[in-house]
A protein has these predicted regions:
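N-terminal periplasmic "start-of-domain" segments of outer-membrane beta-barrel proteins
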Residues: 42-75, 101, 109, 119
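Short acidic/polar hinge/loop motifs at secondary-structure boundaries
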Residues: 120-147
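Periplasmic-side early beta-strands and strand-to-turn transitions of outer-membrane beta-barrels
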Residues: 180-183, 187-190, 194-291
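C-terminal beta-signal and adjacent terminal beta-strands/loops
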Residues: 223, 514-517, 521, 620-623, ...
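Outer membrane beta-barrel strand-and-loop segments of large Gram-negative receptors
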Residues: 247-248, 339-346, 387, 482-486, ...
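Flexible loop and strand-edge segments within Gram-negative outer membrane beta-barrel domains
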Residues: 248-252, 265-312, 317-339, 372-380, ...
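Structural signature of Gram-negative outer-membrane beta-barrels, strongest in the C-terminal barrel
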Residues: 261, 271, 376-515, 573, ...
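Gram-negative outer-membrane beta-barrel transporters
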Residues: 354-356, 395-398, 404, 511-515, ...
């Protein structure tokens, strides 16, 4: 696929490289301290998502996982979904190696809100699983994953959870000198060649940021055939292309510039970022997606302002997203999503012991799909929401051993269709979803704590759930929405028990969510041609968006234990998750639900050397929906080795071995599980540096 390796926006990347060089080569801008003291260059950790008061993950009522630092560096993959897919409670849509969104507790698409620095991503990834998320993990510094309903703070589209990708493109801390990191990677099953440079510089008052990255891959090596033997037996699909996933090559590049005025108690900053991604759609051997995103961000936050209002935070992003789907070298369907999203949050001082925040969020996006395969009309979505979140410490056994939380939110959402020949006349729907949540965290002693959360959540239907009407080639379906949908309503309960003692820790959680009118895409048993005509010989299975009663019930657990200290340290890690999702109206299972997974790992470090072994077993999934094939079990075995080089600048070489058993791994959460397995046995090497 030589066309994938064609550069599309070289001038923009050149400008970014020049900006990086300028930042590094002009020390007079930062004359106060041209050589940075390494002790002063450590960036303060960003508070985790899902709590406006800045509580740490151990202090959260809802379960939150934070991936950052070296752990994130060794977990990075080409997509956000694949970077997170082994976390407890998290899987991925896995539409080949180039497009993969996180799935949280069996929920995906609109119910998992993907954010960048606390502001939503405007792209097309929730519309179709073959559309990549407009973020590259190479430049991310931290990822917060909120598992479970987060509609209170982020709106109904966060009813399944939140993934917040955090970078430092707008510097938030005072910086005196220059700091940065760089990374290169080679190899892997997709013959990857990638690299990234991230630089920050400042003089105590003014700080700038620059980053650039690029990734090239070829078609991915796979164990055996792309088509599963089960699908071959079921419908006679021929088993071709042994050892290679055809049309899975890619090329991505981009970068950003940012600048801030930083003060003792806050900052004001602006950034621009550009992202280009050109990749093969593995569901069709002759289709390429050429994607680009331009985004401007403005952010400010000031703390310690006074007794009544002690904190103010404002963020807004303007996004211009577009992609074109190219078949046999000819542009066919074009997609665009342009709009603004932002929030204003005000934290108040203690009222007695009560602390909290009120906030206002807004979004205005215009989406268009033009071409023969456009299955949604041009549309506009506008939302406005206000929320309040409060915490109150209390005493149950000991002083302040109990923390209570309470919050509520109201939104106004307008979803307008512009109509069209296929979609009928223009139509407007408006919704007023409301959400409320109450939780508690009880510290039994220094080691043990328990927490629980009750929530009632409402979500407005998305534009494609309302207005879809056309062939969706990526899923092989003719999809039809329903303009009469009501607000989606659910109630949930979530509970965790946590233990931490020295170098040992574990968490166990359970949850149950009950939907009174879950919106899902269900087969109608008919076959269609691309014009929407019922045809038993048609290639598209009919699928309608419907509202049904549904339940999601699951368990999650993870732990880390220091089992040896002496000549080095050896840690044992354990993890597991399970979710069961049912359509209560039909008495059937819901589609694409991950099976029970059990995992363990060993991590050893000694002086400059480190190594790890990770094993994850996914059980056979037989609890399947109508017209869905079961998925066989698998065992994924990966290993990592690192070596910190004896240099004055921190340089670390690393090697990652994937799928050491060369097992045929198929994710049940993927639409393509029976035609696109995970990578085969492979080795990736790289070098990472920090200064």
């Amino acid at each position: 696929m030589s066309s994938i390796n064609t550069r599309t926006r070289l001038p923009a990347r050149k400008a970014l490289f020049m900006a990086v060089a300028f930042a590094v080569s002009h020390p007079f801008l930062f004359a106060s301290n041209a050589k940075a003291d390494s002790d002063t260059m450590v960036t303060a950790p960003v508070p985790v998502t899902a709590n406006p008061l800045g509580a740490g993950s151990d202090e959260m009522v809802v379960p939150v996982s934070v991936l950052s630092g070296r752990e994130l560096s060794l977990s990075r993959e080409s997509t956000l979904g694949d970077t997170l897919r082994t976390m407890p409670g998290v899987s991925a849509t896995s539409f080949g190696p180039n497009a993969s969104r996180p799935v949280i507790r069996g929920l995906d698409s609109e119910r998992v809100r993907i954010m960048q620095n606390g502001v939503g991503i405007l792209d097309a990834s929730s519309l179709s699983f073959d559309h990549a998320v407009g973020i590259d993990p190479l430049i991310i510094e931290q990822i917060d994953v909120v598992r479970g309903p987060a509609a209170l703070l982020y709106g109904g589209s966060a009813i399944g959870g939140v993934v917040n990708a955090i970078d430092h493109r707008i510097p938030k801390e005072q910086l005196d000198g220059i700091t940065g990191r760089g990374e290169v990677r080679f190899g892997g099953a997709e013959d990857q060649k990638s690299g990234a440079i991230v630089l920050d510089a400042g003089n105590g008052l003014f700080a700038i940021h620059a980053d650039v990255y690029e990734r090239k891959t070829n078609d991915m090596d796979i164990p055996g055939y792309a088509v599963s033997s089960r699908k071959n037996r079921e419908d006679g699909t021929p088993r071709e292309h042994r050892g290679r996933l055809v049309n899975s090559a890619s090329r991505a590049d981009g970068g950003a510039l940012g600048a801030s005025l930083t003060f003792d108690n806050g900052y004001v900053g602006l950034s621009y970022s550009g992202h280009d991604n050109k990749y093969g759609v593995v569901a069709e051997e002759d289709v390429i997606i050429d994607q680009s995103t331009d985004r401007w961000d403005l952010a400010t936050e000031f703390k310690d302002l006074g007794n009544i209002i002690n904190r103010v935070k404002f963020r807004i992003a303007n996004t211009d997203y577009k992609h074109v789907e190219i078949a046999d070298g000819n542009p066919e369907t074009r997609f665009s999503n342009r709009g603004n999203e932002g929030s204003l949050e005000i934290g108040h001082g203690n009222i007695g012991k009560l602390s909290g925040a009120i906030g206002f969020q807004f979004q205005d996006s215009k989406f268009a799909a033009i071409g023969d395969e456009a299955f949604v009309p041009k549309n506009q979505t506008q939302s406005r929401g206000v929320y309040v979140y409060e915490e109150l410490p209390a005493s149950l056994v000991n002083a302040d051993d109990l923390k209570l939380s309470l919050g509520g939110r109201v939104d106004r959402v307008d979803v307008d269709s512009k109509g069209g020949d296929r979609f009928g006349p223009a139509l407007s729907r408006d919704f007023t979803p409301k959400s409320i949540a109450a939780g508690a965290l009880f510290k039994i002693n220094q080691q043990w704590s328990v927490s629980g959360n009750l929530s009632s959540n409402q979500r407005a239907p998305s534009y494609f759930e309302l207005y879809a009407n056309g062939p969706h080639i990526a899923t092989g379906q003719y999809e039809v929405g329903n303009t009469d949908f009501d607000i989606e309503r659910s109630r949930g309960v979530d509970a965790q028990i946590r233990w931490k003692s020295g170098k040992h820790a574990f968490n166990v959680g359970a949850y149950h969510t009950r939907f009174s009118n879950f919106i899902g895409l269900f087969s109608n048993g008919l076959m269609f041609d691309e014009d929407g005509v019922v045809d038993p010989a048609g290639e598209l299975a009919g699928a309608d968006f419907e509202q049904v009663k549904a339940t999601f019930t699951g368990l999650e657990a993870d732990g880390k234990f220091r089992i040896y200290e002496g000549r080095g340290d050896l840690d044992l890690t354990l993890r597991s998750d399970y979710v069961r999702a049912r359509n209560r109206d039909a008495g059937e299972y819901l589609p694409r639900i991950a099976p029970l997974r059990l995992g363990w790992g060993l991590n050893y470090s000694f002086n400059r050397f480190g190594t790890s072994l990770d094993v994850l077993h996914g059980f056979k999934q037989t609890k399947v929906a109508e017209n869905e094939l079961p998925t066989d079990s698998y065992t994924s075995v990966n290993a990592t080795a690192t070596w910190l080089l004896p240099t004055t600048t921190r340089l670390e070489a690393f090697a990652k071995a994937y799928n050491l058993l060369d097992d045929e791994i198929r994710d049940h959460t993927s639409f393509l599980k029976d035609i696109a397995p995970q990578r085969g046995r492979s080795l990736l090497i790289g070098l990472r540096g920090e200064f």
